[in-house]
């Protein structure tokens, strides 16, 4: 699909434009129009061109530019002068340059893999004429394509390529170095110029990618950002690749490139039921042997994964932090991750030379973690790291790199999950039962707190009453204190008066007694004597009277007779009074009768 109808060679804006096969002799040049981002330059010289501003690559003699594209397919050639460029692309596949420079801001997902063979008997016509043979890959965004960056149901990719190593310079803003492949295959070996690069950003059910079985060089990279049920990727035994070391901005790297045995490295970001991907890595001072690595970001029931990666880090840029090469195996969310064996991870990271004294060097790490998992087993990690030379000048030899130098750590196994192998209904029932129990406990605690609150309120009332009584007692105590102070002041005044009287009596004692005082004293004596005598006379008179009364009481019956007669006289007087009353009543009755008759 293109928004520029007309010439097919110049597409201003394209989504998933397929590659145009180029088959031109060496020295033929085709002009290309420039676009807004990523101008394609035509160079006829044999030197390596410099990087473009926004991911532009220089083409030598033969170019098929796509100025602004999403997922332009790869163009593969056997000639060193045939190249294609994808200035600005999302998920662009391989662009093969033997001496291609890196763009300024770094291409997105592009991997160089120029193919050349050493078979003299089977490649005579191609080497004699110098023609460039291209095998374009599929579009970047496609459904069911063979080579794509975003596809559904990608078929298997079987590659057998041989690529010489190409020196490359580091980009300005942290693009990783391009990776080329070389081979030391004998002349009689089978040859193929088809690149094996499959970048799947979003894939459903991508089958396995199989490498070659011969000793030919193989470079297979399968990157899948989102996959459902992606099978394992099996690397070819005996494949041989060469990784071009990354150089700094101003310095060059004259050391020998590390020869590595590289298989496939599929990486998935989101997977359901992904099978195991096995890998093994060995870091030495001159070579690195690496097989596949697999990582998932979100998985349900992911099986075991054994990962080994060999990722050279990107060189330090001028304005950004040095690249960090990580290989993560993270089943972020997993239910029932059963029978997962121990994961062995080995990482060989090559840090770029530092740009300045305060810049942080590149870090290589391969971690296996679980964000949300039930019953994840233990994970074993093995890491080996080698470092490059300084920023400016040639890279010195690293004497510390020793084969087999690894550091392993074994974390403790997490406790088993209590809800593993349980259905959702069982979990909900358990939670409901726990909620009911906790509710009952909470209600009991609420009742207890209510009782405590009621007790506190009652005690508060008692404390208020006690405080009132205390205030009253303090007021009464203050009044008593005032009274005591008044009494003490009165007592002080009385003491003063007594002191004055005592002083006056002392003055009176000194005076002489007169004759009147003597007479008074005598009169007081006589009066006392008279009073005592009168008392004795009164006692004597009482005794005489008592004796006279005793003698004046004779024993005769006359007094008794007088008493009886007096009683009878009183009775007769009462009877007489009653007679008078009856007579008066009869008289009144008679008067009434007489009044009635007359």
Curated annotation (Swiss-Prot):
Membrane topology recorded in Swiss-Prot or TrEMBL: Peripheral membrane protein
Signal peptide: none
Effect of a null allele: Abnormal spore germination; spores fail to divide with defective septum.
GO cellular component, as recorded: nuclear envelope; nuclear membrane; nuclear periphery; nuclear pore; nuclear pore central transport channel; nuclear pore nuclear basket
InterPro entries (alphabetical): NSP1/NUP62, Nucleoporin_NSP1_C
GO molecular function: phospholipid binding; structural constituent of nuclear pore
Ranges for region Disordered: 1-140, 154-420
Keyword NAD: no
Positions of post-translational Phosphoserine modification: 489-490
Main localization of the protein described in the UniProt heading: nucleus
Record keywords, A-Z: Membrane, mRNA transport, Nuclear pore complex, Nucleus, Phosphoprotein, Protein transport, Translocation, Transport
Cellular location(s): Nucleus, Nuclear pore complex; Nucleus membrane
Entries under Pfam families matching the protein: Nsp1_C
GO BP term, example: protein import into nucleus
Ranges of Polar residues composition bias in the record: 1-13, 87-99, 232-270, 311-336
Biased composition (Low complexity): 24-86, 123-140, 154-169, 176-197, 208-229, 279-302, 337-357, 379-388
Domain remark text: Contains X-F-X-F-G repeats.
Subunit structure: Component of the nuclear pore complex (NPC). NPC constitutes the exclusive means of nucleocytoplasmic transport. NPCs allow the passive diffusion of ions and small molecules and the active, nuclear transport receptor-mediated bidirectional transport of macromolecules such as proteins, RNAs, ribonucleoparticles (RNPs), and ribosomal subunits across the nuclear envelope. Due to its 8-fold rotational symmetry, all subunits are present with 8 copies or multiples thereof.
Protein's job: Functions as a component of the nuclear pore complex (NPC). NPC components, collectively referred to as nucleoporins (NUPs), can play the role of both NPC structural components and of docking or interaction partners for transiently associated nuclear transport factors. Active directional transport is assured by both, a Phe-Gly (FG) repeat affinity gradient for these transport factors across the NPC and a transport cofactor concentration gradient across the nuclear envelope.
Family: Belongs to the nucleoporin NSP1/NUP62 family.
Name listed for the protein in its UniProt record: Nucleoporin nsp1
Species per Swiss-Prot/TrEMBL record: Schizosaccharomyces pombe (strain 972 / ATCC 24843)
Lineage of the organism: Eukaryota, Fungi, Dikarya, Ascomycota, Taphrinomycotina
